[in-house]
Amino acid sequence: MGNRAFKSHHGHFLSAEGEAVKTHHGHHDHHTHFHVENHGGKVALKTHCGKYLSIGDHKQVYLSHHLHGDHSLFHLEHHGGKVSIKGHHHHYISADHHGHVSTKEHHDHDTTFEEIII
């Protein structure tokens, strides 16, 4: 499906740095590029260093060294030209105005991203 960057409502790009999921403000680079892999109706988001964006049992966002089953699979929900990343526990990836990445149970502006094709 190709490479994407995800820019939050607040102008922060989702970013994979080391072992953490963070955000970058204002620009995107290789840390913010995710390869979207199709997995039968769901997608996996693979980082530039080969790790997978994942949501754990306690709703934390983390990077996995391998495809970690449902923890690493998402639905991309499109809303008016934007996208939300919904995980297996029906929680959305969220980036707040401070750039903190977490999950939320409900869809709102913090869970909505501009999807940029790289």
From Swiss-Prot:
Keyword Membrane attributed: yes
Residue numbers with lipid attached (N-myristoyl glycine): 2
Cellular component GO terms, alphabetical: actin cytoskeleton; cortical cytoskeleton; cytosol; phagocytic vesicle; plasma membrane
GO molecular function, one term: fatty acid binding
Post-translational modification: Phosphorylated.
GO BP, one annotated term: actin filament polymerization
Keyword Secreted part of the UniProt annotation: no
SUPFAM superfamilies, per database record: Actin-crosslinking proteins
Family matches, as PANTHER family: HISACTOPHILIN-1-RELATED, IG-LIKE DOMAIN-CONTAINING PROTEIN-RELATED
Purpose of the protein: May act as an intracellular pH sensor that links chemotactic signals to responses in the microfilament system of the cells by nucleating actin polymerization or stabilizing the filaments.
Assembly, per entry: Homodimer or heterodimer of hatA and hatB, linked by a disulfide bond.
Protein name (Swiss-Prot/TrEMBL): Hisactophilin-1
Organism field: Dictyostelium discoideum (Social amoeba)
Taxonomy of the source species: Eukaryota, Amoebozoa, Evosea, Eumycetozoa, Dictyostelia
Gene: hatA
